[in-house]
Every structure is written in structure tokens, then in C-alpha cells.
Amino acid sequence: MPNLGAHVSTVGGLQTAFERAQATTCHVIQIFTKSQRQWNAKPLTAADCANFQAAHRDAGMPPLIAHDSYLINLGSPDNGLWEKSIAAFRVELERCQQLGVGSLVTHPGAHVGSGEAAGLDRVGAALRRLLAEDVGGETQILLEITAGQGTALGHSFEHLARLIELCDGHPRLGICFDTCHGLAAGYDFRTAEGYQTTFDHFDRLIGIDRLRAFHLNDSKNDLGSRVDRHTHIGEGFVGLEGFELIMNDPRFQTIPMALETPKEPDESADIRNLATLRGLRRASVSASPQSEV
């Protein structure tokens, strides 16, 4: 499957992601372009970008996704932290543009007590500012559905639709559906009926064309738990049935899908999880505008 891969380490340099991806049979690569647990990063040099782009070409130009820092909170009611988050997200977008990474996944943030409506307005204002300034060029901003822990925003399709609405439907905005988060948030896509209900609802509120990436993770916690705990494919509450429905939906055959399952000292866990997912795909599936489920 040309659209299946994993989050890959960049220890030793950003360009090392491609060698690791090849070793784990990834055809999609997700990375952090900087430390996800630090605000600042050493600026990319021309050599950094050239080496990364050369390695990308040598690897056959697989789809690339970046994930932003976990420190960023575009929904913060604190003006200082909000501006700091906007500045950090600006850097994330600029780094993607420099490297040629087509999509940046972000968690919509948390309202930290100000309320969901106020938090969403805050995220929308931040995104509007950056989009109006064309920060990141053509880099897509993919809003990730969250599990809904604490005051996290983005745990419902209504939240995600509202953010797109607040940005006047900007074409650079899309959605990343994380299977662990979706289940924890209360979306039950584990049966054919539940799957159709879930993605019909998504299509009505947001538009299926906005679904531009998947994070494929099983969940240690059950439906509606609001707890974000990833586990290996088939070993959690999503189960193989839920993943089989996604893997065989003709609408999603070209959408990048990346694992974020627990790592092991070697690459065996990613190899095993990818093999499990590939084994769920029926040979008859082909790209089509309509789902067969």
C-alpha cells in the first residue's frame, strides 16, 4: 500500500528518517522537524534542507507529514502563551515549507477553563492570522481530532467544523483522523453500521474531502473514555474490525496513514503493525469516490 507508514525518528539528522522508513517498510513518513518538547529550535541551514530533499528524492518522494510541538496551545486564554504559541506554530509551518513537507498536523489546543466556544474562537483567530500572512506557503494545516482529555478542544466533528468555518473554509485546512482519539472521543466506527454513521456525519459537517490523513493507533481505553493511550494494532479497543473498515474504504486508498503506536528498541513493532494493517486489505479494493461499506 503506497499510503501506509509511521512516525519516524530523526535522531542523527532529519534526513535519517528516510533510511529508518525504508527499514520499517514505510511508504508514508511522519516526523517532528524539531524537538517536540522545546519551544526553540536551531534554524535550518541551506545544507540541512538540501540533504533532506536529496534523501527524499532518493527514497522515491514518499508523502511527508510533520507533527508540531506538544507545547503549542493556540486556544490559550493567556495572551502571553497564546502569542508564544502562534510564534512557535509559525516556525513549524516555515520549517515544513523549507523542507518540502506537505502537511503539518496539530492538536487544536485547550481552552484551560475559558470554555469551548472561547477556546475555539482563540484557535480560529490564530489560524486566520497565519493563513492571511501565507505562512508556510502551500503547507496544509491538518487539525487532529483529540481524545478530549481535560479541556482539550477538537474532540468532536462540530469543533473541527467550527474551526474551518472561523477560517472561512480556507483550502489549506484539513483533518487528521486519529483512530485512538476518535474512539476515545465517542465515535464508534468498529462495525459497518457505526463506520458509515461516523463518516457520513463527518461528511455532512466537514466534507470528506477535508479528511487528508489518518493516524492509525489502537486504544488502551474503550469508547468515550476521553483518555489518549495508544497501543498496537489489534491489541486494544478499536480491534481489527475497525481498522479493516478503514483499510478497505475506497475513498481513503490514497490518503496518507501513519502509525503512532508504541516503539520498541528496534523497528520490529512498526514492521509488525504495518504487516497487520496490510493483511487486512482486500485485493479487490481500488480508489473510488464511493465507499463500499
From Swiss-Prot:
It catalyses: Endonucleolytic cleavage to 5'-phosphooligonucleotide end-products. Binds 3 Zn(2+) ions. Belongs to the AP endonuclease 2 family. The keyword DNA damage applies. Endonuclease IV plays a role in DNA repair. It cleaves phosphodiester bonds at apurinic or apyrimidinic (AP) sites, generating a 3'-hydroxyl group and a 5'-terminal sugar phosphate. InterPro entries: AP_endonuc_2 (IPR001719), AP_endonuc_F2_Zn_BS (IPR018246), Xyl_isomerase-like_sf (IPR036237), Xyl_isomerase-like_TIM-brl (IPR013022). This is Probable endonuclease 4. Keywords: DNA damage, DNA repair, Endonuclease, Hydrolase, Metal-binding, Nuclease, Zinc. GO terms for biological process: base-excision repair. Zn(2+) 1 binds at residues 67, 107, 144. HAMAP family: Nfo (MF_00152). It is an enzyme of class 3 (hydrolase).
